[in-house]
Amino acid sequence: LPVPCRVYAPVGSHKDLLPYLVRRLLENGANSSFVHQVVDRRASLEALTADPVERLRGFASKRHPAIPRPVDIYGHERRNSEGVDLSDPKALAELARRLASLPAAHARPGVESREPPRPVCDPADRRREVGSVVFADAEAAERAIALAHRGQGGWERRPVEERAALLDRGADLFERHLVELVGLCVREAGKTVLDAVADVREAVDFLRYYASEARRLLGRPTELPGPTGERNLLSLHPRGVFVTIAPWNFPVAIFVGQLAAALVAGNSVVAKPAEATSLTGRLCCDLLHRAGIPADALVFLPGEGSVVGKVLVADPRCAGVAFTGSTATAFAINRAMAATDQPLRPLIAETGGMNAVVVDSSALLEAVVQDTLDSAFRSAGQRCSAQRVLFVQDEIAERAIEMLTGAMAELAVGDPGQLATDVGPVIDGKAKDKLLAHAQRMEREGRLLYRARLDEACAHGTFVPPMAFEIDRMSRLTEEVFGPILHVVRWQAGHLDAVIDAVAATGYGLTFGVHSRIDETVETLTSRVKAGNIYVNRNIIGAVVGTQPFGGEGLSGTGFKAGGPHYLLRFLTERTLTVNTAAVGGNLQLMGALKDEA
C-alpha cells in the first residue's frame, strides 16, 4: 500500500530497554491508548487527533469530599500557603511577564544612617544593577535598638489575638505580592524561580503557623495542681527586644520566620538581614508594616555584621538573639553575649552541617540519583540542609556513580530567571573562590567524577559548576562546603558502624538521609545517628513548617526547632503565680467541694 510507515526500534542495553519495553506495553495495551483505538472502527479521526490538553480542560472537575483541598490540609488551625503552578503554561507565561516588568528596588534602615547608598548587583550577571541599599552605621544601630526598646511595652500589651491577627494579615500580603518577592529572590540572591516561590511560601507558612501557636500557648495561663486553698498559675511572657540575624540563602523564609516568632511572642525586634539580600528584607518588613505591625515594634536594620551586629549584641537592652548562619559566627555571637555582666540572654542559633546520605545495596538507584540531585545541587548547594556526602555501598558504587554523573550532565546551569535553569550562581565572588579552591584540593586528594561545563552566559556571574568527587574518607572534609560540590565515599558491607562513626566525628548534626529497603539497616542508622532531621528514602531538603520542624544539634545549632511546637518558648520567659485562696477567711474551694457532696 502507498502508505508511509515508520519503524520504531529503540536501541540500547538490556538493563535500559527492558523497563522501557514494559512501560510501552503497559501504555499501548491500555484501552485508552492511541494504538488500541486506532484499530477500533467506532473511534473517529477527530477523536483520535484531538488535543489532549484541550480534552483535559473540558473535563468536569470533581473533588472527593473526604479529601481536603491543598489550601485546607491543616484544617481549622491555619490555611496552607499558595504558590504558582509551574506546570501550567499560562501561569508560567504570566509569571515571566510580571517578573520582566519589576522596577529597581531600594532599601534603607528604619532609622537615620549617614552611610552612602551602595549598588546591589545580580549574582547571575554582576553587570546588572538590581537597586541600591543604605547600610546602617554604629550610631544607627544604637538608635534602632533604642526605638525598639521604647516600642516594646506597647507591643507587649496588645492581646495575643491581635498580634497573631497581624501576622495572618501579613501572610495574606506576602501571597498578594508573591511576584515582587520572587523577583528579588531571583535577582538579588540568585535563586531559581522554583526555589524562590518555595522561599516565599515557607515565609507565609511561618507567619500563619506561629500565629496559631501563639494563640495556643499564650491564650491563658496554665493552672497547675496543688493542695486545696492554693492556686498556682504558670504564664508565659515576652523577654523584651530581640535581635534577629538572618542568612542570604533564604532571604524571605528565615528572615521572616525568626522575626515573626519573636513578634507574636510580644517582643519587639531589630531585624538585620544578610548584607547580600537587604532589598528582599526591606520588602518583607514593608509588607509587615503595611499589615499593621508598628515601626517601633519591628525595626529594619541592614548593615555589615562587623559594624551593627557587634553593637546590637553588646547592648544591654538586647534581651536575646535569633541567628541563622555559619557556626563560626554563632560562636562569635555567643562569646560577645557572654562577655558582659548583663543578665544571661538566650541565643537561638541554627548553623551548618556536613550532611550525609547512606545508600545500601538494596536501594532503588533511580530514586537515589534523583534525590541526590535535589539534595546536593538545588539552590546551587547553598542550603544548610544540603547533601555534602554520599556514602554508597561498594557493591553498587560503579552503577550508582555512572547513573549520577549521567544525570548531572543534564543539569542546566545559568540565569536563575530562566525557568529551564536547574542551578543558578553562588552568592558572591568570595564564595565562588572558596569553593573553587576546595575543588582544587579535592582533585589532588580524590578523584573527579564529573564537572559541569559553564557556557558564555555564565561568564559575568558568580557561577560554580556542579561537581562530584570520590574521596576515600569523610574526614577529608574539614569544614562545611557551602555550594554545588558532592563527595562520594564507598563503604563495604559489614562496616556500617564505621560510617556512623565518620558522620559523628564531624560534630555536626543537622540533616541525614538513608536509602535502603531493609528495615534493620534503616533502624540502625536512624537510631544511632544524631541529627536534627533524618529522612528515609527521599531527599534531605525542603523541611515543611509544622510538619518537619527544622534544626540541628551539636555544631549545627542550639534548638528549639524552627517551625515546631516548641520554638516560641525560646522567645518567652515563665512566671509562676501562687495565691493563698484561704486568706480571704476560708477555703472556698474546699467548701464548694463539700457542698457538692452534700
Regions found by a protein language model. Give the residues of each.
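ALDH superfamily catalytic-core signature
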Residues: 287-293, 314, 320, 327-472, ...
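Hydrophobic alpha-helical scaffolding
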Residues: 7-15, 24, 81-88, 134, ...
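Rossmann-like NAD(P) dinucleotide-binding subdomain of oxidoreductase/dehydrogenase enzymes
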Residues: 186, 216-367, 398, 420, ...
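Generic, well-ordered alpha-helical scaffold segments in large soluble proteins
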Residues: 24, 28, 147-154, 166-173, ...
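N-terminal Rossmann-like NAD(P)+-binding subdomain of aldehyde/semialdehyde dehydrogenases
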Residues: 30-230, 410, 427
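Conserved C-terminal structural/oligomerization subdomain of aldehyde/semialdehyde dehydrogenase
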Residues: 4-8, 22-45, 123-133, 140, ...
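A glycine-rich phosphate-binding loop feature that marks nucleotide/adenosyl-phosphate handling sites
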Residues: 12-15, 22, 38-53, 170, ...
